[in-house]
Regions:
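PAPS-dependent sulfotransferase catalytic core
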Residues: 1-72, 83, 87-91, 100-106, ...
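A generic "structured core" feature
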Residues: 1-19, 23-30, 84, 92-96, ...
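Short catalytic/ligand-binding loop motif for oxyanion handling, primarily in non-cytosolic enzymes
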Residues: 16, 72-75, 101-106, 165-170, ...
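The conserved 3'-phosphoadenosine-5'-phosphosulfate
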Residues: 34, 145-250, 254, 268-276
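Acidic-and-aromatic substrate-binding clefts and catalytic sites of carbohydrate-active enzymes
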Residues: 39-47, 71-77, 134-135, 163-167
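Generic structural signal for well-ordered alpha-helices
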Residues: 49-53, 81, 144-145, 260
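Surface-exposed cleft-lining segments at the edges of enzyme active sites
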Residues: 67-72, 124-135, 243-248
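PAPS-dependent sulfotransferase catalytic domain
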Residues: 82, 90-95, 102-163, 170, ...
Length: 276
């Protein structure tokens, strides 16, 4: 059993909210793990199709879906669109985006809290691998280029995070129409802020949880149990992240300007509220 639709990103743009709202739909079977990362060669591709199929219920008529923001991080994880097209050629794709600068800043905070920026020096951050890793995920036009080589524009639904916040039911109705199921009322928005919770979990525990051993142990318990454990652990004092300077924001706007203009042309959406 392979997915009928895939939320391909972008990171820190509401993919968890989409995943949870779709999980509550009676005609949808979302993957056991929200982020299967199956089509990422550097992550779970080696586990094979049997493992991936096991993320979904073995039978039934419900639409199957998953949500892996790493599917739109081509700088670090190339080849994802080709693998999806090979095994799920008829999949409906969903790509939710937000202000590219705000998204990059949110990913920066998230990465810092996970310990991915332990050697961070803000004086030399611009131009570093960490900088390009974060900015690349906001190059929305570049990220969908390879997808549009294998899928039609009609197969790709582009959503705006701010519209999801302002009109959640309308956006979810767009999603259900795109994947071919009846609309379903949502119970509020339920925006999920990982970083706010992560900031209160002790750093050593976070590092273990995101290690291969930690992920393997997490597979042994239900999603509801994992949420309860994380909520229990998130009782400490919130850790602070380094300030994001106006100069750094200006550099990101400069570096993303051309790509963002091209994204507007591809999608036909103006995204007038964005900083770039």
């Amino acid at each position: 059993m392979l997915p009928d639709f895939i939320i391909i990103g972008s990171m820190k743009s509401g993919t968890t909210t989409l995943y949870r709202n779709l999980s509550a739909h009676p005609d949808v079977d979302m993957s056991r793990e929200k982020e299967t990362d199956f089509f990422v060669a550097e992550k779970n591709w080696r586990l094979g199709l049997d493992w991936y199929s096991g993320q979904f219920l073995p039978q039934g008529t419900r639409k199957r879906g998953e949500a892996s923001p790493n599917y739109t991080k081509s700088r670090d994880f190339p080849g994802v669109p080709e693998r999806i097209a090979q095994h799920c050629p008829d999949a409906r794709l969903i790509y939710i985006v937000r202000d590219p600068v705000v998204r990059a800043e949110s990913q920066f905070r998230h990465s810092f809290l996970l310990g991915a920026l332990d050697d961070l020096d803000m004086a030399t951050f611009e131009g570093s691998h960490g900088y390009h890793h974060i900015v690349d995920a906001s190059r929305y036009a570049h990220q969908i280029d390879a997808y549009l080589e294998h899928f039609s524009k009609e197969a790709l639904l582009i959503l705006d995070f701010d519209r999801l916040v302002q009109s959640p039911q309308m956006v979810m109705d767009q999603v259900t129409a795109h994947i071919g199921i009846a609309p379903h009322p949502i119970d509020g928005l339920g925006l999920h802020n990982d970083s706010a919770q992560l900031s209160r979990v002790p750093a050593p525990i976070l590092r273990f949880a995101h290690s291969s051993t930690g992920r393997a142990l997490a597979d042994l318990v239900s999603r509801e149990t994992r949420d309860k454990i994380r909520g229990f652990l998130a009782k400490g004092k919130a850790r602070k992240t380094p300030p994001f300077s106006d100069g750094l924001r200006a550099s990101i706007r400069r570096d993303l300007s051309a790509d963002t203009d091209r994204f507007r042309k591809i999608t036909g959406q103006d995204f007038a509220h964005w900083q770039v």
